[in-house]
Amino acid sequence: MEFPLDPLLTPIEARVLGALMEKQLTTPDAYPLTLNSLLLACNQKTSREPVSHYESGEVQRCINELQERKLVEVDWGARAARYDQRLTRVVSLDKAAQALLCVMMLRGPQTLSELLTRTQRMFDFGSTQAIEEKLQHLCVKTHPAFMHIPRLAGQREDRYMHLLSGAPDLEALAAQTHNRSERNDDGRTQLEERVTLLENQLAELQAQVARLLEKSAE
């Protein structure tokens, strides 16, 4: 399959696939995810822009549609079905590209410094220069999955975003920036990352307990 996807991803599809990709890289022992774990991952209060409030039924319907598109695969366990994303295999993305795509799907357009901070638990780029070189390569493909957004009014840096949900409305992005002050990466972002780390550790422990219960039931 080539980019762009046909049809493009809806907001909930992007959130579901992004959450699956994130947990696959950050908490592999808790992956694939059950419906409940996936719902919690989609509706996290941290590392999500915007924060969502999806219901279980909405996520289940989305999963069913993604299964039909071969973008999600179900793993039938002893106690509950678990869901595995297939997007990165369908479109042949390596781990570095998966980490970048994951953050953009969950948090929208990102600066290089934001990507460096927010991908560090998924892939060790080491520097913003390494990320920039990777994105430059990805942005010049015949059917690119990523796009470079020059610095807009009210912004200090260029940004990058994914194109799996379509091309951006640059006027809307500029308006969002005008109505919301820039985040301080050395403060709030680092706090969010620490909270997310604790959430992921809790999810991993819960998954380990669930797997032990599955084994005891066999």
From Swiss-Prot:
<comment type="similarity">
    <text>Belongs to the UPF0502 family.</text>
</comment>
<dbReference type="Pfam" id="PF04337">
    <property type="entry name" value="DUF480"/>
</dbReference>
<protein>
    <recommendedName>
        <fullName>UPF0502 protein CJA_1529</fullName>
    </recommendedName>
</protein>
<dbReference type="InterPro" id="IPR036390">
    <property type="entry name" value="WH_DNA-bd_sf"/>
</dbReference>
<dbReference type="InterPro" id="IPR007432">
    <property type="entry name" value="DUF480"/>
</dbReference>
<dbReference type="InterPro" id="IPR036388">
    <property type="entry name" value="WH-like_DNA-bd_sf"/>
</dbReference>
